[in-house]
Curated annotation (Swiss-Prot):
A single GO cellular-component term on record: cytoplasm
Phylogenetic lineage: Bacteria, Bacillati, Cyanobacteriota, Cyanophyceae, Acaryochloridales
Enzyme class: ligase
Gene for this chain: murC
Listed name of the protein: UDP-N-acetylmuramate--L-alanine ligase
Pathway participation: Cell wall biogenesis; peptidoglycan biosynthesis
GO biological process: cell division; cell wall organization; peptidoglycan biosynthetic process; regulation of cell shape
Top-level lineage group: Bacteria
HAMAP family for this protein: MurC (MF_00046)
Length: 475
């Protein structure tokens, strides 16, 4: 059994977005925390400032020479392989070993928890809910899968019993959670490394729903509408219909955001304005409204909080503008996410804006996902004017030798007239140096390391701008 007392917590892979959030919460609660990762990053540096002992590198020595007593309970994610030397040392030393989902489940059990699940939209929706509870004075503890400026990170410790958490389905650990409120944004086939079929995915979400006291779910998703059941189910939709609890009409999507009138069971609540773009974010906002109204928060407070919300890091995050080119970083790595992101971007391109062309750069994530969803990946870039595909980011998967980024590009050429395949990040940088022009909105898409290229591409454009200015002065 997990102990929340004198026994320390040691996280193998503490620099990950999910692991670091849990480590932060435990450290802020006054528990002794340590962890290791292969290299330092911004998250490990923040944890070190809290007094968390950080080991760089993963080796048996981290536990064999552990600085605290007693030996820790060791926390791993699904990314940690069974042959990891630190994991093997934990087994040899008899350390209690838990999955990161066990820590989150234990924290939920001690709280009035709101868990946000879904194939897409988890981070934005959970961040929106957390921001609403903050603005409503409910002082929640927050654990999300992205960094949010409002609480300067991916986690926050509040003083109330409320906990807002993002609940990951990728490895099936969603089945461990028993939240007070379970939010399900959508259900689609993903993570084929874990799930063999859509039916398995639906079954996992159904068990999560069964274990929640109340479920709030999107009726626009066929797999929710037709397959999900719960005796206390609140639904929301972008379509005005009597069968749902929350819906909208008079929707206006613009380059600045979205406006809509919100309905609650046939009664108009008022007008909602959002600064985040696209239909998918309006859906996310409806989930937030349903949660807020269930908690007794008035619509004016909800609408004000949603208007102020500016998004999470790597969710259509603007990285800057150089030489008349706008750079966007987005985590989208599933076809539905990519399509939603590009459709939102399309709202900002045209005669009424400075932006005239969308250039999408996509790094496929995992061989298993790419192979399973190949046709959908080929079809989801129609809202872009030009697309560049890199080779696949493995995320630790072995290369099966049956799928590559070139296959994605070949598939995309059946549906798109302007496609490049640049296998390496260096090749992408070279191609963009010749391709980009003032008026471009370039979006870097994927869950791998593609976004690390953005500063270099921006620096190239800075250099081009300086060179052009120098030539103009010389003339």
């Amino acid at each position: 059994m997990m102990e929340f007392n004198e026994r320390p917590f040691h996280f193998i892979g503490i620099g990950g977005i999910g692991m670091s959030a849990l480590a932060y919460i435990l450290a802020k609660k006054g528990l002794r925390v340590s962890g290791s990762d292969l290299r330092p990053n911004r998250l490990t540096e923040q944890l070190a400032e809290l007094g968390v002992q950080i080991f760089i590198g993963q080796s048996a020595a981290n536990l064999e020479r552990y600085p605290f007593t007693p030996l820790p309970q060791v926390i791993c994610s699904s990314a940690i392989r069974s042959d990891n030397p630190e994991y093997l040392a934990a087994q040899h030393l008899g350390c209690p070993i838990f999955h990161r989902s066990d820590v989150l489940a234990a924290l939920m059990h001690r709280s009035q928890s709101i868990a946000v699940a879904g194939t897409h939209g988890k981070t934005t929706t959970s961040s929106m809910i957390a921001y609403l509870l903050l603005q409503a004075g409910l002082d929640p503890t927050i654990i999300v899968g992205g960094e949010v400026a409002a609480w300067q990170g991916n986690a926050r410790v509040g003083q109330s019993r409320y906990l807002v958490a993002e609940a990951d389905e990728s490895d099936g650990s969603l089945r461990k959670f028993h939240p007070h409120i379970g939010v399900i944004t959508n259900i689609e086939l993903d993570h084929p490394d874990h799930y063999n079929s859509l039916e398995e995915v639906v079954a996992t979400f159904q068990q999560f729903a069964d274990q929640a006291e109340i479920v709030i779910a999107c009726a626009d998703c066929p797999n929710i509408r037709d397959r999900l059941h719960h005796p206390r189910l609140l639904t929301y939709s972008l379509q005005r219909q009597a069968a749902v609890d929350y819906c909208v009409d008079h929707i206006q999507y613009t380059a600045e955001g979205t406006t809509a009138r919100v309905w609650e069971r046939g009664t108009s609540l008022g007008i909602l304005q959002l600064n985040v773009l696209g239909a998918h974010n309006l859906q996310n906002a409806l989930a937030v409204i349903a949660v807020g109204r269930y908690l007794g928060i008035d619509f004016a407070t909800i609408a004000a909080a949603l208007l102020e919300f500016r998004g999470a890091r790597r969710r259509f995050e603007e990285r800057g503008q150089v030489n008349g080119i706008r750079f966007i970083d987005d985590y989208a790595h599933h076809p539905s996410e990519i399509m939603a992101t590009l459709e939102a971007a399309r709202l900002q391109v045209g005669t009424q804006t400075p932006w005239q062309r969308i250039v999408a750069v996509f790094q496929p994530h995992r061989y298993s996902r790419t192979q399973t969803l190949l046709k959908a990946f080929g079809q989801c870039f129609t809202a872009a004017d030009h697309v560049i595909f890199t080779d696949i980011y493995s995320a630790g998967e072995p290369d099966p030798g049956t799928i590559s980024g070139a296959d994605v590009a070949t598939c995309a050429r059946q549906y798109h007239a302007s496609v490049d395949y640049c296998p390496t990040l260096e090749a992408v940088q070279t191609r963009l140096a010749h391709l980009l022009q003032p008026g471009d909105l370039v979006i870097f898409l994927g869950a791998g390391n593609l976004n690390q290229l953005i500063p270099s591409v921006m620096a190239d454009q800075e250099q081009f701008s300086v060179s052009s200015l120098t030539e103009a002065i010389a003339l």
